[in-house]
Swiss-Prot record:
Coiled coil: none
CDD domains referenced in this protein's UniProt entry, alphabetically: YjeQ_EngC
Keyword terms, alphabetized: Cytoplasm, GTP-binding, Hydrolase, Metal-binding, Nucleotide-binding, Ribosome biogenesis, RNA-binding, rRNA-binding, Zinc
Function of the protein: One of several proteins that assist in the late maturation steps of the functional core of the 30S ribosomal subunit. Helps release RbfA from mature subunits. May play a role in the assembly of ribosomal proteins into the subunit. Circularly permuted GTPase that catalyzes slow GTP hydrolysis, GTPase activity is stimulated by the 30S ribosomal subunit.
Cofactor note: Binds 1 zinc ion per subunit.
Protein name according to UniProt: Small ribosomal subunit biogenesis GTPase RsgA 2
Family as reported in the entry's similarity comment: Belongs to the TRAFAC class YlqF/YawG GTPase family. RsgA subfamily.
Length: 353
């Protein structure tokens, strides 16, 4: 088995992560006249697809829907794009910078490994941000903490992450040690799709290489003076580990703004929303209002002030971006209507003359 999935060898649909959810979307005609493929790499020039018939390149075309690594697509007999199958899960973020757009990260993921190093990169608020994205996508999150040997506060930091949620899986590993990384094996069984997400240089590619048992992704060290990664993954790709799971290694993300993520934020900060139900006033802003159950929890030490402030921040961010996306979609809809009217008027003029 070629772990990097770069050869032209065929894979069974089960190996590629095929599930009943996708099978239910196919007709008899689809089975007879199309090839079922999964996108295993996404580059500027196009997509790399794997199927039971082998490996294919699919050029990006403006008429295609937006697609990314993890998507299932159907190709016709000429190996041309025919249809994108409905996604079981979808990881996305607001595109970096001021651009008003939602960027796909990966799709059809079963487990999201949220990777954070226990050196200067350690940041609980960033972990909560990733958890919100995972929960919005209905993907099981697992927090993977690396570089424990670089921090004298490693044990304290691990406990802090575990306290974010009683049901949250947290694993501290040495990314270079196969025995240590084997703690992730329960989520890496045959046919499952997992993805790594985290800042640049936290060890995502190193973890991938250790699971694969080979140097597949280019990696670089972290400078001790500023803890910044020097070499990072630049394109999304899928790899198959010996145990049979598919791993999506995403580029490091210097900026990760939430898109429409209200459900994810609510689930990540569930205890705050539960406390809010006990406030004296229904419109309580959890600031200085009398009878605020949230502020009372902060005062008695059962809720961290940092966590409340991050909840406020993520709520504002996702609400703003969601409304911005909605406005953009409405403008595009109106523009589409105008174009159709113009085409209709032109057709009428041709008919008249």
């Amino acid at each position: 088995m070629n772990n990097t999935m770069t050869s032209s060898q065929p894979y069974t649909l089960t190996q590629l992560g095929w599930k009943p959810f996708f099978q239910q979307q196919l007709t008899l005609e689809d089975y007879e006249n199309t090839q079922i493929c999964r996108i295993v790499a996404h580059h500027r020039s196009g997509y790399q697809l794997c199927s039971e018939q082998g490996r294919f390149h699919l050029a990006i075309h403006h008429a295609q829907p937006k697609m990314t690594v993890g998507d299932w697509v159907l190709l016709d007999e000429q190996q041309q794009f025919k249809r994108l199958l409905e996604r079981q899960s979808e990881l996305s973020r607001k595109a970096a910078g001021s651009k008003i757009a939602e960027q796909l990260i990966a799709t059809n993921v079963d487990t999201l490994f949220i990777v954070c190093s226990l050196n200067d990169d350690f940041n609980l608020s960033r972990i909560e941000r990733y958890l919100s994205i995972a929960k919005e996508a209905h993907i099981e999150p697992v927090v993977v903490l690396t570089k424990a040997d670089l921090s004298p506060q490693a044990e304290q930091n691990i406990t802090q992450v575990q306290q974010l949620s009683a049901t949250l899986w947290v694993e501290a590993v040495n990314a270079l040690d196969p025995a240590s990384v084997s703690a992730l094996q329960p989520w890496c069984t045959k046919g499952r799709t997992v993805a790594f997400i985290g800042s640049s240089g936290v060890g995502k590619s190193t973890l991938t290489n250790t699971l694969l048992g080979e140097e597949t992704q280019q990696t670089g060290g972290i400078r001790e003076d500023d803890s910044k990664g020097r070499h990072t993954t630049t394109a999304r790709s899928v790899h198959m580990i010996p145990d049979g799971a598919l791993i999506i290694d995403t580029p490091g993300m210097r900026e990760l703004q939430l898109a429409d993520c209200s459900e994810g934020v609510s689930e990540t900060f569930a205890e705050i929303e539960t406390l809010a139900q006990h406030c004296r006033f229904k419109d309580c802003q959890h600031q200085q209002e009398p009878g605020c159950a949230v502020q009372q929890a902060i005062n008695n030490g059962t809720l961290e002030a940092r966590r409340l402030q991050n909840y406020f921040k993520l709520q504002r961010e996702q609400a703003y971006n969601a409304s911005t996306f909605a406005e953009q979609r409405n403008r595009m809809k109106q523009f589409g209507k105008m174009c159709r009217h113009v085409q209709s008027d032109k057709q009428k003029l041709k008919t008249t003359y």
